[in-house]
């Protein structure tokens, strides 16, 4: 069981820069939900926002009534109320969650998070280090604290896990580690990812794990809007 509380939050995007956002459980991006393939999960969502909301489980295969699309498969969660989502995790992989209610406001304010479903077999696609990066973008005027809403492409702050360079957390590994990096993109534009000094293999997409025979080597990869990619490499260089 998990409990998400949709609420206003404060987030330090960079040293000394505080933004007034919306998120989950006091943070934006929201907490990462982790479970195992085959689990049945029950997720309580409490709405402490000034308007109705939903949670859409982006990429997960589940019943329509649990998909969290406001006005289509879900009436929305009114302010002050709690809704319970419950569904089975039928495949492993990397997924995301976000509202499908007043998206141009709620997602622009930072409401999103990652959802990782680990394989039932712990030996399948095993790595030594496993990192998550959520790409998000904001439009915040200098000297202000609240993002502009209803913005399609005029973002001025690009964040990794809601942190701005150079205050992004480093990926710390040991030499020789097999490393996986999972990247989800909930901005409004495609985003290329490049690893300086390394090549890697793309091992997972939105559709699932890529068989070893189909994995391809890369030094840069484009992450489409609303998509996820995972890549792996061996950390055989110091620095």
Feature locations, PLM:
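Copper-binding active sites and cupredoxin-like electron-transfer domains
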Residues: 1-239
